[in-house]
């Protein structure tokens, strides 16, 4: 159960986390022949959120599911559980090809398991406005996903890359660096957009 592993973070009293461990690597194998293997995460989240409501605890506004860079059973579980998809994308050529593949996969998962799923937001990351490639990639993404592509772009930043080695999000470790400022602006933009898709607790 999620309630057995969820922890309150040191960064905010309203920010909770379900941390991953090395044991996650075995999940792909464990779920190969499991019943409802694509829906395990959705069921676990529904149980946890309903439990909070029954106990009269504060409602969780957002559930963010961080996915591995693959289309394995873990990622499929995340898409089946999600109400909408936010895709962070590096402003590079191969990332553009990967975006096309990912969106097709998401559409397929939506058809079979989660009709309410959609790519509602795309965030450009590691963006270097000095390069022609980055600007061309941005133009392509905005052409094909004009409504989903967010205005805020995350620039390349050494401080962002360094922050994990200090065990802290960059917005706490160096809140004034360009990367931290951009991430805070991105969070505001996402919050203002709201969550128009179905809630994770609804039936797909």
Stretch-by-stretch model annotation:
Residues 1-204:
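P-loop NTP-binding core
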């Amino acid at each position: 159960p999620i309630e057995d592993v969820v922890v309150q973070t040191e960064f905010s009293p309203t920010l909770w986390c379900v941390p991953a461990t090395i044991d996650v690597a075995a999940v792909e194998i464990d779920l190969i022949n499991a019943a409802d293997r694509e829906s395990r995460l959705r069921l676990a989240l529904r149980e946890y959120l309903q439990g909070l409501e029954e106990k009269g605890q504060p409602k969780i506004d957002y559930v963010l599911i961080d996915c591995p860079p693959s289309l394995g059973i873990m990622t499929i579980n995340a898409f089946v559980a999600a109400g909408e998809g936010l895709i962070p994308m590096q402003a590079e050529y191969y990332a553009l090809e990967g975006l096309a593949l990912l969106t097709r996969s998401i559409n397929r998962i939506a058809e079979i398991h989660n009709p309410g799923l959609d790519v509602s937001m795309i965030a450009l990351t590691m963006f270097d406005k000095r390069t022609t490639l980055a600007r061309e990639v941005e133009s392509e993404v905005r052409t094909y996903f004009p409504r989903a592509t967010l205005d805020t772009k995350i620039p390349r930043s050494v401080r962002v890359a360094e922050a994990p080695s200090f065990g802290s999000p960059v917005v706490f470790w160096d809140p004034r660096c360009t990367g931290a400022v951009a991430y805070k602006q991105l969070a505001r933009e996402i919050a203002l957009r709201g969550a128009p898709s179905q809630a994770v607790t609804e039936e797909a």
